[in-house]
A protein has these predicted regions:
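N-terminal beta1-alpha1 cap of cysteine-dependent amidohydrolase-like domains
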Residues: 1-78, 84, 90, 103, ...
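Short beta->alpha junction loops/turns
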Residues: 8, 62, 146, 182, ...
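A residue-level structural signature of the nucleotidyltransferase/glycosyltransferase Rossmann-like core
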Residues: 44, 78-79, 101-102, 133, ...
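Histidine-centered divalent metal-coordination motifs
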Residues: 83, 163, 200
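Pocket-forming structural segment of enzyme catalytic cores
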Residues: 92-181
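C-terminal and late-domain segments of enzyme folds
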Residues: 156, 166-242
Length: 242
């Protein structure tokens, strides 16, 4: 079984429906967990999130989820953080003040710099336009390292993003994929048995569902995050919409 943590923020239902869509052919139950529990009763944990880092981490702690989450990671349970859920895995965030994260993945969450330029839009005169913050829309995933989470994901695949802050990973080996939005930043990471994905898989159509299916395939095979222990996710029985 996979536990999706409900700590009162964001995109819970859409993430649940996306997991449900890929879980059915694998016959892996997906539960929404809205109270602190011993997560080792499940085979993996998903931490979704949408909104401000400070509100999210405060909700998580206020509802008593921090300790059981850390104990689950320490026990080797696979953990997947999505969007703000990914950011919470890092040490700290500078979003609207300084906030302490869960210290699962080394690094910090930082705001996109002001005045970023997009060289890809330069007209003949060489001028570029200023990129807007937040980044909202489709952008590419540039694969940097092999990982079973990214099986069958082509380099340059498009995913859907909506965020003003990015994860600055302290360990280069943690970076699985990067995305260019004025700066080249980590968009998919992994540290031991914890993974994080900045784009919204539930909004990223076939690519997003493939990433979730890959995660579930690893869980089904009993993978606890060892490199190279991938599992075949199988074909996705759903229309390609991008």
């Amino acid at each position: 079984m996979i536990a999706i943590v409900d700590y009162g923020v964001g995109n819970l239902r859409s993430v649940y429906k996306a997991f449900e869509a890929v879980a059915l052919p694998m016959q892996i139950p997906v539960d929404i967990v809205d109270a602190p529990a011993d997560f080792t009763r499940w085979r993996a944990v998903v931490l979704p999130g949408q909104g401000a880092f400070g509100d999210s981490v405060n909700n998580l702690r206020r509802q008593g989820f921090e300790t059981p989450l850390l104990e689950a990671v320490q026990a080797g349970l696979p953990l997947l953080g999505i969007c703000v859920g990914m950011q919470l895995l890092f040490d700290e965030s500078e979003e609207m003040g300084q906030h302490e994260g869960l210290h699962i993945i080394p690094g910090a969450v930082r705001r996109f710099p002001d005045g970023m330029r997009d060289p890809a839009t330069a007209p003949a005169n060489g001028l570029t336009h200023t990129l807007r913050v937040p980044q909202i829309g489709w952008n590419q995933l540039h694969l940097r390292r092999f990982d079973p989470l990214l099986a069958d994901i082509p380099d340059g695949a498009h995913a859907y993003f909506a965020h003003s802050y990015y994860c600055d990973a302290a360990a280069p080996d943690a970076i699985l994929a990067t995305t260019d939005y004025g700066i080249d930043y980590p968009s998919i990471v992994r540290w031991r048995n914890a993974w994080g994905i900045q784009p919204h898989p539930e909004k990223s159509h076939t690519i997003g569902l493939r990433i979730l299916a890959n995660f579930m395939a690893m869980v089904a095979r009993g993978c606890q995050g060892e490199e190279g222990e991938g599992a075949e996710a199988g074909p996705l029985d759903m229309p390609s919409v991008r």
